[in-house]
Amino acid sequence: MSYRTHTCNEISLEDVGKKVKIAGFVETIRDLGGLVFLDIRDMYGITQVVTSGKTEDVDFASHIPIESSVCVEGIVKKRDEETINPKLKTGLVEIKIETIEVLGKRTKELPFEVNKNQVVREDLRLKYRFLDLRSKKLTNNLILRSKVIQYLREQMIGNGFLEVQTPILTSSSPEGARDYLVPSRVHKGKFYALPQAPQQFKQLLMVSGIDKYFQIAPCFRDEDARADRCPGEFYQLDMEMSYATQEDVFSAIEPVIYNTFSKFSSKKIAKYPFPRIAYKESILKYGTDKPDLRNPLYIIDLSEFFKQCTFKPFINRTVRAIKVNKHLSKGFHEKMLEYAISLGMPGLGYLEVQEDMSLKGPIDKFIPVDLKKELIKIADLKSEDTIFFIANNEKRAAELAGQIRTELGKRLELIDENSFQFAWIVDFPMYELEEDEKITFCHNPFSMPQGGMEALLTKNPLEILAYQYDIVCNGIELSSGAVRNHDPEIMVKAFEIAGYTKKDIEEKFSALFNAFQYGAPPHAGIAPGVDRMLMLLTDAENIREVIAFPMNSKAEDLMMGAPGFVTKEQLRELNIRITETK
């Protein structure tokens, strides 16, 4: 016995007169009195079937619950001209039912209609994800996900990379986010951790002599959700290369990313090499280390200029400005002011350049006449330009200017939605100051400092740059990477500056530190996020749209009821007791 001879997307005019079998879900039922039409759906498409004129057939078919699973056998016939559906691949034909069998009857009320253009609460969608995934949109997302991963794998293998699976149960290590911990039954009081990334393992593979490694790696981080970040787990194209420089990594991964986006999207994409932007320049020019280069607006630093003025809100402040090549309506300025206030800004000053090159706006009276020409020159202002001003401390001014730049780009419809703009952010600072003025690592502590040991010994730590890099696309960070610090002596000194002792390194990174004392090759790597790539390829507003069974924003799996309580017996086996804390 076979449930089907064809999928619901394969029946065509070539099959007219043939007996076929299909199986799928009942999407719609149309009872026209003497005849009943049903649309049968599987993951490939939809085929229309129609009953014979027999009363018992009509009665049976009309009472099948929508979304039940059925098997239909019948003869393919050509549709009448007036019933042809050009929207369906099978729209020229239909199946005249000889037998229809309900394989799985829906016995519960649907929490929402599948494949209908309606707004459904996310908690319902996630609780009944098995129904949500029946929708054409999510099915197509999963099909695309499978194809993208297969293509990534083919490219990496074709480029000489070896696929290696690394452990899922490992030790806890301080890599930035919180670990998911797994208690050991055998070793009382001890815990495994799910890996935040295969970072140490892939570096150990380089020490092992594996020249070029990759895997589609699951990563686990106990962190808060964002639109582009799902709590719990995510997947990345993890890769590492021995005897590699920063440029070697760029040359290896750029074609992979370019080819993938070109193959699975019709949007425009600039050919590699992708632009390189220094971190400091990115913060100044775009207000972020994840710039959306589709937005042509950029930020100007006017801090030095405004030291000459007496405008109180700008005194002793970092002042950033954004220029727009047009005058804007009063309503536009009011909306931008509302947005600025929502960010915590006291206001949003601006000036408009008139035809005679005079300046007009809320703050023009605070700029001396003799300095206005200087402002026009410094900001390269032209007739009909509008320039916005943001003032705060240096860090906050950059953040706010970046947000204002993004909002202006959206409101003025300057962003080309039909393109992907990639860029490398390079030359990250090795260290930064915490709120308590202590020096800490800015990003990846395993990165090689530019200048090596000499830089660590002679430079101000806050001026040392690292061989760290991010690849960003349309304002989304796809991945971070780095040239690794493979020299134990340089590693000890680098960690010492951040307040760690050699003993700390030996305890927290014992395997890696020990391995590096056995002749480690220089190595570098990166790990583009698969979920984020798919989010961009599908234009999804939330990363959960490209994951089969995601958690909600509270790190809950509403369908499976996770996290959940376990029995006292299970806890006892693990030598764990739960106590209430005040």
What positions do the PLM features span?
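Class II aminoacyl-tRNA synthetase catalytic cores and aaRS-like
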Residues: 1-582
